[in-house]
């Protein structure tokens, strides 16, 4: 029962936050994270391309990535698994590169920037490794790297959980954002490590 509830919560959060970028097209640009950006940055064509590429394709990756972990879906339709995988890979590669670029302009300065840039690099590299493993038919290694990849992707969810909590604790958005730049993904990777270790012990991967 606990496992089922955890899975439902996991999928629900992935879907909700995966659809979240659509809000940026429905409300004024002063909303949310954009309210902390300087006008000259918001008027930059290159930055806007990077920002919207990152949030749209990152949202897509989050929205469809969980499907790959469903053994039932994979068993029933391996073709769907492969097609979703290709779409996920494409979305991640473009979103992570865009994320690395906009990371240089992150609110909170160099510490915040390094956090998000590191996340972008790790997301790109783990996904690339997952792709190379499956190309070489190394299924277990592929599965492990995909867990790490989606753990990095899930940072979009954990960021939105931690940020309001940190703002309430510190009473300052900038301070909270510097912390969340690391807190949104480092614990995720630690959890991914525990999951892959446990699955390896059970012989699943």
Language-model features, listed with the residues they occupy:
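Alpha-helical membrane insertion/targeting regions
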Residues: 1-205
């Amino acid at each position: 029962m606990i496992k089922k509830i955890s899975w439902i919560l996991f999928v629900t959060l992935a879907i909700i936050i995966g659809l979240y970028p659509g809000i940026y097209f429905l409300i004024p640009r002063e909303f949310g994270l954009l309210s902390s950006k300087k006008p000259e940055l918001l008027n930059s064509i290159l930055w806007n391309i990077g920002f919207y590429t990152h949030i749209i394709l990152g949202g897509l990756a989050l929205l469809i990535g969980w499907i790959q972990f469903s053994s039932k879906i994979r068993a029933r339709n391996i073709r769907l698994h492969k097609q979703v995988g290709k779409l996920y890979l494409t979305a991640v590669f473009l979103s992570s590169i865009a994320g690395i670029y906009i990371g240089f302009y992150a609110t909170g300065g160099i510490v915040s920037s390094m956090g998000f840039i590191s996340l972008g690099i790790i997301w790109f590299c783990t996904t690339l490794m997952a792709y190379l493993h499956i190309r070489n038919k190394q299924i277990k290694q592929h599965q492990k790297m995909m867990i790490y990849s989606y753990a990095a992707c899930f940072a979009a969810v954990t960021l939105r959980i931690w940020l309001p909590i940190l703002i309430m604790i510190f009473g300052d958005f900038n301070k909270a954002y510097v912390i969340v730049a690391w807190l949104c993904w480092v614990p995720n990777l630690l959890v991914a490590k525990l999951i892959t270790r446990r699955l390896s012990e059970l012989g699943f991967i």
